[in-house]
């Protein structure tokens, strides 16, 4: 099927969301990028937004409703583990629905806010939207001084730069393993660290002057 790559991408993206959520602690949920600035979503609000936004896009744009018209898109108790369980369940149902769709379904135009776009186009935008917010949460983990497992490739905690052949180390091998591990209090893969190697492209260097932008090497995280 021509659009199988979108289904496969969603299947891996949902795991990445859950993996990043699993890196937080319960006490992190109220944390914002700047404590006194309400413009930046807290960790809690990012989880709420992911559940609500994805439900709305799938239901109103793609025609896939797994939450009963939005009635059950949030967990009854808004804790870290309950958000993980809710998103794992709902995104799994969405994945099953996507796997049943044929090419004409993907190519049909639907309403995307105030314009018409194909469902395939909408799905690309949905994946990008999710990735954007996941990146914000990964930045929050660094602000909190936490370790980060792989999301797309190496991170500073899995070995540093891809150019130095740092390994990719995922927190869990599957959604099922993630749920089981987090219910036991956490059972993530061990992180090797960088063993003294550089973990960023310009370690220890002063910021470049305005107008100067040297090319970057393939990096991490």
Task: Give residue spans per PLM region.
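Hydrophobic alpha-helical core bundles mediating ligand binding, dimerization, or RNAP-core interactions
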Residues: 10, 14, 21, 87, ...
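Active-site rim elements
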Residues: 1-8, 78-84, 124-127
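Short, contiguous alpha-helical
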Residues: 7-18, 29-73, 111-178, 182-206
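Acidic catalytic patch
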Residues: 99-113
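Ser/Thr/Pro/Gly-rich low-complexity, intrinsically disordered segments
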Residues: 205, 211-213
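Membrane-proximal, proline-rich intrinsically disordered regions
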Residues: 24-26
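Helix-adjacent hinge/juxtasegments
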Residues: 64-101
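A cross-taxon signal for low-complexity, glycine/charged-rich
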Residues: 214-221
């Amino acid at each position: 099927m021509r659009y199988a790559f979108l289904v496969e991408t969603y299947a891996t993206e949902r795991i990445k969301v859950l993996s990043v959520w699993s890196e937080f602690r319960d006490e992190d949920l109220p944390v914002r990028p700047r404590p006194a600035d309400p413009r930046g979503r807290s960790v809690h609000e990012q989880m709420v937004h992911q559940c609500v936004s994805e439900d709305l896009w799938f239901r109103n744009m793609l025609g896939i409703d797994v939450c009963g018209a939005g009635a059950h898109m949030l967990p009854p108790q808004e804790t870290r583990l309950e958000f993980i369980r809710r998103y794992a369940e709902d995104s799994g149902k969405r994945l099953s629905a996507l796997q049943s769709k044929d090419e004409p379904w993907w190519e049909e135009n639907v309403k995307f806010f105030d314009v018409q776009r194909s469902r395939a186009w909408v799905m690309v935008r949905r994946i990008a939207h999710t990735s954007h917010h996941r990146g914000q949460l990964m930045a929050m983990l660094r602000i909190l001084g936490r370790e980060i497992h792989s999301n797309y490739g190496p991170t500073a905690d899995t070995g540093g730069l891809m150019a130095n052949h740092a390994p990719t180390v995922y927190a869990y091998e599957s959604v099922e393993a993630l749920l089981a591990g987090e219910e036991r209090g956490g059972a993530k893969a061990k992180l090797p660290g960088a063993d003294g190697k550089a973990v960023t492209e310009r370690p220890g260097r002063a910021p470049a002057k305005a107008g100067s932008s040297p090319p970057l090497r393939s990096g991490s995280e």
